[in-house]
């Protein structure tokens, strides 16, 4: 009987350790560290002349607020998937991101390395997206706007 109790305790501990492991998102990959709001602070080791905020949600969706090609913020939404350390995404209109990104999240910094012929390195920092940017951002465009990702 004593050995059955010891076995039960060992099994419960094993189950607890497995249950407390890193959480994976609904479509794979480690989204826990990525979840939250980010602001672009460096683009190819230089301060960007444009603004990009991204809110990565733990359910695999995102909202991106960019002031790249216009004076106003543009809102792009969609879904993302992480496979290993590579993130890819699709916009709400069904178009894919320009490329995939190898990602690294450490101490509130997200580094994204584009997987294209000439790699671009983007550095983001955790932030709170200002409410006025969220309120101002528009999905209505007078001209064709190219999304940042």
For the regions a language model picked out, list residue spans one by one:
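Bacterial N-terminal signal peptides that target proteins for export
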Residues: 1-8
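A ubiquitous, low-specificity "background" feature that marks scattered single residues
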Residues: 8-9, 36
């Amino acid at each position: 009987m004593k050995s059955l109790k010891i076995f039960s305790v060992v099994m419960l501990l094993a189950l607890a350790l497995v249950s407390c492991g890193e959480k994976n998102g609904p479509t794979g990959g480690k989204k826990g560290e990525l979840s939250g709001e980010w602001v672009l602070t460096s683009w190819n080791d230089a301060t960007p002349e444009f603004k990009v905020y991204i809110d990565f949600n733990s359910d695999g969706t995102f909202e991106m607020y960019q002031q790249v090609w216009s004076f106003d913020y543009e809102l792009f939404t969609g879904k993302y998937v992480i496979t290993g350390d590579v993130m890819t995404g699709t916009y709400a209109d069904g178009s894919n991101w320009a490329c995939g990104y190898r990602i690294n999240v450490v101490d509130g910094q997200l580094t994204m390395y584009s997987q294209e012929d000439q790699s671009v390195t983007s550095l983001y920092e955790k932030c709170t997206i200002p409410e006025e940017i969220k309120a101002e951002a528009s999905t209505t465009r007078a001209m064709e706007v190219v999304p940042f990702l």
